[in-house]
Amino acid sequence: MTMSDVFTSVVLVTFPSEIQYDNWLAKFKTFYNKKAIEFLRDNGQISQRASRVQGDDVIRITIIWTYRNYDSYEKCQKFHGQWGKVGGEFIAKASGCRGYEVWTDLNFISPE
């Protein structure tokens, strides 16, 4: 795996209220349980994280998925695509972008 192979997907989700955010977070944690994460790892997902954006007047979450390569991304999308069926109803606006990694601090950190 070279750094140019690593593929990343980033989504910014905006919620109109704490209630909608809490609803989403509970379902997100249920959907991405240990078994789901094991499946995704087995199919090439390196990591997944969700962070709440600070210092904003609105409620926003940034979700970052990292994959070994584009093929891994495509394999994992079969699972991620089920979110709409399982996630249920909540009000939010999402926008995202995807692409190949061009730089990482891991180039400067030696493995222990």
Please annotate each region the language model reported:
Residues 30-47, 56-57, 64-103, 110:
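An amphipathic, aromatic/His-enriched active-site/gating alpha helix that lines ligand/cofactor pockets
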Residues 15-28:
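Short, surface-exposed ligand-recognition loops at beta-strand->loop->(often short) alpha-helix junctions
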Residues 6-15, 62-64:
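Active-site-flanking beta-strand signature of metal-NTP-handling nucleotidyl enzymes
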Residues 2-7, 54-58:
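Short, flexible turn/loop "capping" segments at secondary-structure junctions
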Residues 12, 104-107:
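Short amphipathic
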